[in-house]
Regions:
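Mobile, glycine-rich extracellular loop/lid and propeptide segments
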Residues: 2-287, 291-335, 339-348, 352-392, ...
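A broad structural signal for short, well-ordered beta-strand segments within beta-sheet-rich domains
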Residues: 5, 47, 113, 157, ...
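Long, well-ordered mid-to-C-terminal structural blocks that present hydrophobic/aromatic surfaces
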Residues: 376, 381-388, 397-478
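Short, contiguous acidic/charged loop-to-helix segments that flank catalytic cores in large enzymes
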Residues: 433-440, 485-499, 525-529, 563-567
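A beta-strand-loop signature enriched in Asp, Gly, Thr, and Trp
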Residues: 471-510
Length: 598
């Protein structure tokens, strides 16, 4: 089995599970603990891209195991994973300066390579998408997105593949609508890259996801011709539908179908696909026939308008700005739960946030042998998608009388995933009833769940939401998920109330086939979206659960950085990588920590 990590979350199904690990067993981690082997320093403190790893690559006259890391300063590094030697670094251009125009919290110094690159091992190429200031000023309004192709051995651009400018890419949506043009000044490229049929797939959200110019884009670049081969826009008539997925990458089926999940935006089931899980098909160019990206299925739970009390099935819903929300009723559509009242928080204080409950906050992970995809967003509800026949939701399907039939298109009924509250019905005909904050905390899921087939429990999946604990589930041939247990530790225990607590758990798993599973998790102490906050690294036994006093299952911690007073800044949407006996941990203080058994 390969020990390479060539893409975000280990593989293109986005399972997050490295099943070729024989050193980092639960017994070894518990008995020996973990220590820092190497500290690798980068040129920008906020590392957003997941580290990648290639085993046994010849550089010079030496076979090496190499860690590749892209940074927000538009630099890509290659280090020897065993010695820490810097093998090369490559600068792709002047990054964009951090500002409140890009992120209201302004905790990023630079904006450059935000997404995780993808590596073509056979070709020896790393592909990265860089946000570059075209005039060198660093002003975001001069920024352009470029695709780079770097030699894995030297870090130099591949001959014949200079930086490819994506500006001006066009998409013709048909239906009598105008041709759309891609503009970098409006877009943010956070989702990890993928490769399908000889093309790099690049997904975009928007700098301001609730603006009228917000849209999701998918661009396919043919790596043989080094040209833009196809593009697709998620909201051609309306707006919104960003594809950001908290830095997760599009998930790729065995038949090369591309799965993405969109955030808040308009929905009509024809040209607008906000708040939807979408299957795309990429067809490469053939002779004089242009390449294409086309919708081949989707499923949608609700519209943003329905969340704010507008027409439940509406088409091209009004953008949900605070001023727009004033047009909607102020009481009936927002549940004022008692504990929220006790905190002095009025339901209306959530205002526009109820129209920003991104389904696409978590991305999607595929369990191909069951024919399903798992996804969850800011509501913390698990939706189990039938990836063979996702259902193709129409606006009329979202009317209360037909909601049950729309849920029936799923492979299993929705369930509460990142938390549990008996007062919340995840199979509701009226999505406005989801507008509440159980325990006065958000329970968003940011990033894909981790999936793994265990010799003990069968098919498992793990999640960890904002302000919540790590949770383990099992799922069988009936495709219904059953809760196994949770950790005692919670994310963001010191985040200020009310709400707060982004982003929850960043998790991955290492195992030796279906045995010796270890879940590796990074959680913040505070709210890692609004502020810089320290992080906490934990290792858990993935299968051998203990019992709490009430008899429920406990996921047992094997090792905890808190016990050793480790200090590192939490890397927001990033995740640890466990491979070849090492745990590679990116940080928000410019370090890549390489850990191993003590």
């Amino acid at each position: 089995m390969s020990t390479d990590v060539l893409t975000r979350s280990i593989d293109l199904a986005r399972t997050g599970a490295n099943t070729a690990e024989s050193v980092l067993t639960p017994a070894a981690v518990k008995a020996r603990g973990v220590k820092i082997l190497l500290t690798l320093q980068t040129d920008d403190p906020r590392i957003e891209a997941q580290p990648l790893y290639v085993a046994g690559i010849k550089i010079g006259e030496t076979m090496r195991n190499v860690i590749y890391q892209a940074t927000m300063a538009n630099t890509v590094y290659a280090w020897d994973a065993d010695t820490g030697d810097l093998l090369w670094k490559s600068s792709l251009g002047v990054p964009i300066n951090g500002s409140t125009a890009i992120d209201v919290h302004n905790i990023n110094v630079k904006w450059g390579i935000l997404s995780t690159p993808v590596i073509d091992r056979a070709a020896g190429i790393l592909y990265a998408c860089a946000w570059i200031s075209s005039d060198g000023s660093g002003n975001w309004q001069t920024g352009r997105h470029f695709l780079a192709a770097l030699d894995l051995v030297t870090g130099k651009p591949i001959p014949g593949k200079p930086l490819l400018n994506l500006e001006g890419t066009t998409y013709d949506p048909g239906h009598g609508l105008p041709v759309l043009q891609f503009r970098s000044v409006e877009r943010k490229q956070r989702a990890a890259l993928a490769m399908v049929k000889g093309a790099v797939i690049i997904c975009f959200g928007t700098i301001t996801e609730t603006s009228k110019t917000a849209r999701g884009w998918v661009i396919a670049v043919d790596v043989s011709t080094w040209a833009i081969a196809a593009a697709w826009c998620s909201t051609a008539r309306g707006s919104g539908g960003g594809i950001w997925m908290s830095a997760a990458g599009p998930a790729i089926q065995n038949d090369n179908s591309i799965w993405v999940v969109t955030g808040n935006g308009d929905f009509d089931g024809q040209t607008d696909f906000g708040e939807s899980a979408i299957r795309l098909r990429y067809t490469p160019a053939m002779g004089q026939v242009k390449g294409s990206l086309s919708v081949a299925g989707w499923w949608t739970p609700w519209t943003d308008g329905a969340r704010a009390g507008a027409d439940l099935k509406g088409e091209a819903a009004t953008r949900l700005t605070a001023s727009a929300l004033e047009k909607f009723p102020k009481v009936s559509n927002f549940r004022l739960v008692p504990h929220l009242a006790r905190m002095g928080v009025k339901a209306r204080d959530m205002g526009a946030a109820w129209g920003d409950q991104d389904l696409g906050a978590g991305g999607i992970v595929l369990i191909e042998h069951l024919g399903i995809g798992l996804l969850s967003g800011k509501d913390g509800i698990l939706y189990t998608i039938d990836i063979t026949n996702p259902g193709d939701t129409r606006p009329a399907d979202l009317a209360p009388a037909k909601a049950a039939m729309n849920y029936a298109k799923l492979a299993a009924q929705p369930i509460l995933y990142t938390y549990f509250d008996a007062s919340v019905d995840p199979v509701t005909p009226n999505p406005a009833t989801l507008n509440q904050l159980p325990a006065n905390r958000t329970h968003h899921l940011h990033g894909t769940p981790v999936t793994w087939f265990s010799a003990i429990h069968g098919q498992m999946h793990f999640c960890g939401g904002e302000n919540g604990n790590l949770r383990a589930w099992t799922i069988g041939p009936a495709k219904v998920s059953f809760y196994l247990g949770c950790s005692a530790e919670v994310a963001s225990p010191t985040a200020a109330v009310p709400a707060g607590g982004m982003p929850g758990w960043g998790i991955s798993l290492s195992a030796n086939g279906s045995n010796d599973g270890v879940v590796w998790g990074i959680i913040p102490y505070g709210d890692a979206n609004r502020t810089l906050t320290n992080g906490r690294l934990l290792a858990y036994d993935a299968t051998n659960l203990a019992r709490y006093a009430d008899g429920s299952g406990e996921i047992v911690a094997l090792w905890d950085s808190q016990d050793w007073n480790w200090n590192f800044l939490h890397p927001k949407f990033n995740r640890p990588v466990a491979v070849a006996g090492k745990i590679i941990v990116p940080t928000y203080d410019g370090r890549v920590m390489v850990l191993g058994l003590a």
